[in-house]
A protein has these predicted regions:
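Active-site residues of response regulator receiver
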Residues: 18, 62, 92
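Short hydrophobic/Thr-rich beta-strand motif most characteristic of the beta2 strand and flanking loop
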Residues: 35-42, 50
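Receiver (REC) domain active-site loop signature in two-component systems and cognate sites
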Residues: 65
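C-terminal output helix
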Residues: 116-125
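Active-site beta3 strand of CheY-like receiver
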Residues: 54-60
């Protein structure tokens, strides 16, 4: 995301990963006004395919998904030299310490719990993108 002086920065690519369409749509509505290029995946497996093809700048990753859950996806991403630099923001309705610790150990940089607040979500997204810029 480093941009030479005088060159307009390309919008950040944000991958939203959730098996529930309503959650993906809600995140799209919250993030669209900030001009991000939004990618979506409906499963952990699909997320890994998209990451391999499009290398997003940030991943918003729900924990509770059938098949490969968010913890497993984060661990795979952070275990790969090609993707370990991509920040992962885990989104969950689980607000207990063990879930957060498990996510951080899997490699997530941050957590947000439902119900999501647009201002907090957008601030966290901008913060994580700044940290990797």
């Amino acid at each position: 995301m480093n941009t030479p002086p005088g060159v307009a920065a390309a919008p950040a690519r944000v991958l939203i990963v959730d098996d529930e369409r309503h959650n993906r749509q809600l995140l799209e509505v919250m993030l669209e006004p900030d001009g991000y290029v939004l990618l979506t995946a409906t499963s952990g497996e699909e997320a890994l395919e998209i990451v391999a093809q499009q290398l997003p700048d940030l991943i918003l990753l729900y924990i509770m998904m059938p098949g490969m859950d968010g913890y497993q996806v984060a661990a795979r991403l952070k275990g790969d030299l090609a993707t370990r630099h991509i920040p992962v923001l885990m989104l969950t309705s689980l607000d207990d310490r063990n879930s957060k610790v498990h996510g951080l150990r899997a490699g997530a940089e941050a957590f947000l719990t439902k119900p999501l607040n647009r201002a907090e979500l957008c601030a966290r997204v901008k913060q994580l993108l700044r940290e990797v810029a």
